[in-house]
């Protein structure tokens, strides 16, 4: 029997909430206390890590692990590594030399509170902690997965093209390149890490990676649309900032209506491919649907 939209929403929200609680508890254990020296650096690290957020990437890691019948709590090492990596990217993305944003998750960005130097080091620290946690899994392939997602063929490569495209008229191919690398690569890694740590077969790992890349791109398309349609209060960051900065976004290239259609199509195709895999795909499909219906 199919669930109603309201039932689905509650199911997804409850799963994400429970995942967030698990990840937050683990992050508090893995990160140094604010009182530990150097205190200013650790305050900056925890300031951004515990500023809120959906914890979508670690939730996808947990969901992928469970879908592949993984057992045990070691998956929390990877889940926390993903959230640390994501937070590192946000801290650096907000810097004056990058996107120059003043607000993130409803409060001043890291560099506005601690200064640029400490913010850079806080981001660096989170990235180092992420790889330290992955090393504790004893699975070198997991370290390689995250490294590929972040490197010049991943997030960093996408960020470079994003910066170089500001204020320029670019086509859909360029926008796809930016966001397949800058955003989707890390979401893809979230799914792959869960499958790897569950001991999944290569077919499932590759399929979950492809699913992650497609829903990751859909996530970014929705983000671009929300930047134009939502308020600063709802987003927790400056609404309309992408348009103001001349960023390469989907609405700027194909319009809002076509952007929404693209996001839905990506998710629908991702779900169809997911159902071909020998895994329990239920919660992953619901999270994919949530990506296109979220309002912040």
Question: Model segments located where?
Answer:
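Mg2+-dependent prenyl diphosphate-binding active-site environment of isoprenoid biosynthetic enzymes
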Residues: 21, 31-274, 279-295
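N-terminal amphipathic/basic leader segments beginning at the initiator methionine
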Residues: 1-31
């Amino acid at each position: 029997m199919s669930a109603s939209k309201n039932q689905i929403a509650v199911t997804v929200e409850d799963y994400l909430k429970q995942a967030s609680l698990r990840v937050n508890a683990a992050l508090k254990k893995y990160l140094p206390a604010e009182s530990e020296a150097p205190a200013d650096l650790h305050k900056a690290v925890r300031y951004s890590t515990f500023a809120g957020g959906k914890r979508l990437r670690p939730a996808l890691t947990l969901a992928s692990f469970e879908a592949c019948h993984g057992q045990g709590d070691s998956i929390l090492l990877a889940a926390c590594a993903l959230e640390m990596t994501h937070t590192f990217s946000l801290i650096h993305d907000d810097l004056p030399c990058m996107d120059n944003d003043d607000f993130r998750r409803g409060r001043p960005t890291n560099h506005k509170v601690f200064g640029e130097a400490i913010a850079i080091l806080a981001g660096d620290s989170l990235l180092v902690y992420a790889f330290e946690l992955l090393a504790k899994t004893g699975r070198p392939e997991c370290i390689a997965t995250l490294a590929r997602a972040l490197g010049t063929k991943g997030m960093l490569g996408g960020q470079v093209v994003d910066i170089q495209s500001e204020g320029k008229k670019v086509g859909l191919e360029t926008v796809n390149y930016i966001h397949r690398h800058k955003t989707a690569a890390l979401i893809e890694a979230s799914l792959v890490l869960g499958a790897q740590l569950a001991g999944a077969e290569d077919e499932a790992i590759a399929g979950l990676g492809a699913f992650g890349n497609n829903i990751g791109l859909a996530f970014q398309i929705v983000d671009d649309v929300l930047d134009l349609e939502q308020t600063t209060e709802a987003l927790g960051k400056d609404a309309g900032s992408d348009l103001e900065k001349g960023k390469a976004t989907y609405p700027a290239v194909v319009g809002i209506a076509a952007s929404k259609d693209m996001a839905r199509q990506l998710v629908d195709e991702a779900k169809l491919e997911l159902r071909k895999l020998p895994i329990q795909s239920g919660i992953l499909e619901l999270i994919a649907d949530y990506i296109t219906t979220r309002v912040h």
